[in-house]
Design a protein with these regions (language model features):
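Conserved G1/Walker A P-loop phosphate-binding module
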Residues: 1-77
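Flexible beta-alpha connector loops of hexameric P-loop NTPases
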Residues: 41, 73-83, 105-111
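Helical "lid/switch" subdomain of P-loop NTPase nucleotide-binding domains
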Residues: 48, 83-86, 114
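Conserved alpha-helical scaffold flanking the Walker A/P-loop in AAA+ ATPase domains
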Residues: 55-58, 86-91
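Active-site glycine-centered loops adjacent to acidic/histidine catalytic or metal-binding residues
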Residues: 71, 137, 166
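Conserved C-terminal guanine-recognition region of P-loop GTPase G domains, centered on the G4
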Residues: 88-160
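Conserved AAA+ ATPase "SRH/arginine-finger" region at the nucleotide-binding site
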Residues: 164-170
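Conserved small/polar residues in nucleotide/adenosyl-binding loops
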Residues: 178-180
Length: 180
């Protein structure tokens, strides 16, 4: 599997196709986001490690340029070292991506902590300095005040853009921004 991924990466580099990795805490909606923007079904379940391997889909950006989006395994706090090693090949996609899309579950009371955990893991992997868009997902499930508070709490941690949306509903003011 590792050899196959390496071959696929070399082909992407040869074709000069931009890549983005969808990262975030487990059950934040990463696979659902990939399904939404690619128009193809990606398995998404409300359970730990529903995604065990990467899934990549090619989308076309509004200006016609192709982009390869890769769904990665969800992060969890205090991930045992042996699991980090087991998921290394899938986590490697974040390191090799041109930029990252971090999905944060706005309805989770631990949303900020999960966001910070994801940043810590990305830093440990050597991907913490990648350009990033943060998707504040499931905003349809939280009051407007909570959404605003979350955006305010996340803003100091990074210099990118926070995109509020509901992946499940397929809407939100940020949906068009996801198409970078």
């Amino acid at each position: 599997m590792t050899r196959q991924r390496a071959t696929q990466r070399k082909e992407r580099e040869r074709q000069a196709v931009a890549t983005a990795a969808i990262v975030g805490y487990t059950n934040a909606g990463k696979s659902s986001l990939l399904s939404l923007v690619s128009g193809s079904e990606v398995m998404a379940r409300d359970m730990l490690f529903a995604t065990l391997d990467t899934t990549t889909r090619k989308i076309e950006l509004p200006h016609g340029q192709p982009l390869l989006l890769t769904d990665t395994v969800g992060f969890i706090r205090n991930l045992p070292h042996r699991l980090v090693e087991a998921f290394k090949s899938t986590l490697e996609e974040a390191v090799l991506a041109d930029f990252l899309i971090q999905v944060v579950d706005a309805s989770d009371p631990e949303a900020v902590r999960h966001y910070e955990t994801t940043l810590e893991v990305l830093n440990e992997l050597g991907a913490g300095d990648k350009p990033m868009i943060v998707v504040l997902n499931k905003v349809d499930l939280v009051p407007e005040e909570r959404r605003g508070a979350l955006e305010t709490l996340l803003a100091p941690h990074f210099s990118g853009r926070v995109v509020p949306m509901s992946v499940k509903e397929g809407n939100g003011e940020g949906l068009s921004l996801i198409h970078i």
